[in-house]
Each structure stands twice: as C-alpha cells, then as structure tokens.
Amino acid sequence: MDNLNNITLNITEIFFSLQGEAKEVGLPTVFVRLTGCPLRCNYCDTAYAFKGNNPLTISHILNEVSKYNTQYICVTGGEPIAQSNCLKLLDSLIEAGYKVSMETSGSIDISPVNSKVSIVMDIKTPSSTEEKQNRYENLSVLQSKDQLKFVIASRSDFDWSCDLLKKNQVKSEVLFSPVYESLEPFQLADWILEKKINAVSYTHLPLPTKA
C-alpha cells in the first residue's frame, strides 16, 4: 500500500465555499486547487494557478479537507491530472468516503480516473484559442454521472458546439456557460431554446473563493 505521507502534489489552495456551478451548485464544498496547466485559454479566470511551489502530501491534504463539515470535494486547477499523483489523491478521497468531483480541461486522457469520481470536462471552443488541444477520445469515456461543459463567447462558439454534439453521442449532462462580459446569459438561453437541444445554461454564482 502506498504511503500517503510520501506522495506529494503541488497545491495552489484549499478552501471551503459553496459550489458555484454544475450539478452540485449551492452545496458546501471543499475545493482543492492543483497548480499548473498546459493550456492558456484567453478567458481563463484562474491564471494564478499556472505556477507555484507548494508541495503537500496526500496525508496533509486529507487532514485539511477533514476540517470542514461537508462530504463534497472538488479537485480543480489549473489542470489537475497534469500532475500524475492526482489519480492517487482522487482514489484516496473516494476511499475516505467523500463525494468527489474533478474539473478538467479535457486535454489529457481521463480514462484512468477513478470511476466513482464525477468528471466535469471542458471542450475548448474556438474562441478559447486552445481548441487544438481537445482530446476528443475523452467524449466516449464520459458517463451519465459526468458533465460536459462548453464555455461560450459568441454565436460561432455555440454553433460549433452544437455541431460537435450532433457528431458525437454523449452520455453525460451537457452544460453551456457564457464567458463573463462577452456574452449575456439570456442570449445564450435564447440560442439553446432556438436549437431545442437538451442542455443546461448556467453562470457562476458570485460566491467567496477563500476560507
């Protein structure tokens, strides 16, 4: 058995807040933000997580999250699985009895992720400038417990996303999110109704992000 005192990950922050998006919106959640990301999306709101040097052992992380009265843990980034030890962290959180979700850019193979983890995966739209990094093979890995997210800045992004959904059978829930200050939420909602697609439109709740 691995010694969790010897396995480290580079962590940007661990904080307690309400989940501001996706299925668990509004639920008290501990967020574990891992450092580093291979992408540079032009609308990224967590660029502060690109770099840093704060190695923590998995034992330390488990101890930190246990201080909060919640069963919900969200592992995020950056890009969490850019760090290979993230898989062991996810396994350890599941073994500890938590309900775990992981937010990923979709640019790295998600098939090794523990099957009990709920995956929230982006597909990068053209306006992100990182469309070429999409790993489309991941679409077939997603299950009904998971979520596929499109961040939309324009009508062309939306039409591109709808075309991709037509070409792929996706088992997961589909989410559309407007880029802040680029697209009004009501406009995105109108497009979804116009296309009559089975998707959820949401915006981030204005919630605190630090404990």
Place the predicted regions along the sequence by residue.
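Conserved Radical SAM active-site core
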Residues: 9, 28-29, 39-117
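Conserved small/polar residues in nucleotide/adenosyl-binding loops
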Residues: 203-209
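N-terminal pre-triad scaffold of radical SAM enzymes
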Residues: 7-40
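Radical SAM/AdoMet-radical enzyme domain recognition
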Residues: 85-166, 170-172
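C-terminal folded domains that constitute the principal catalytic or ligand-binding module
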Residues: 175-177
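Catalytic cores of alpha/beta
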Residues: 186-189
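Short Gly/Pro-enriched loop/turn and capping motifs at secondary-structure junctions
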Residues: 153-157, 179-184
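Hydrophobic beta-strand scaffold residues
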Residues: 100, 199-201
